[in-house]
Amino acid sequence: MREQIMPQQNFTTTISVDQSPEEVFDAVNDVRGWWSGEIDGTTDKLGAEFRYRYQDLHRTTQRITEFVPGKKVVWHVVESHINFVADKTEWNGTDVVFEITRRGDKTELRFTHIGLVPAIQCYGDCVGAWGFYINDSLLNLITRGKGQPNKKEEAGK
């Protein structure tokens, strides 16, 4: 008997802006400007790794595995710890993909988190967070020059 496997629905969202693909690419790589002030490491070089932390709830290490100026960036999650789910490492081995395409007089940014699927426990919370960071914070960084990243925590807090 063969088991039928349902296709996994990776989380994806798309925004369209007036800015050039190069401007969108630069904003994507300004991770501290739209995701978090709690980023350590290099976020704009092929092969580089950077770490993200949000309080004691979530931390990850990403390696930049694709870096094509004006077109594409891929982060491979090499380590993660999500404190509010049973499998604290459920992001390990997933990929965060930013694809940039010129469509007429607009630039389209398609964000996909490959491996962030409804079957994993953090899906609802993680989709909500990515939705904000991409559709609000990154969009505002691209179009207005200022995103809404998590602030860097003060020492001792």
Label for each model-derived stretch:
Residues 1-43:
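Hydrophobic ligand-binding cavity/cleft-lining segments
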Residues 14-16, 51-53, 63, 99:
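Generic structural detector for well-ordered beta-strands
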Residues 36-41, 58-105, 114-116:
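Hydrophobic-ligand binding "helix-grip"
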Residues 115-157:
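A conserved amphipathic terminal alpha-helix motif
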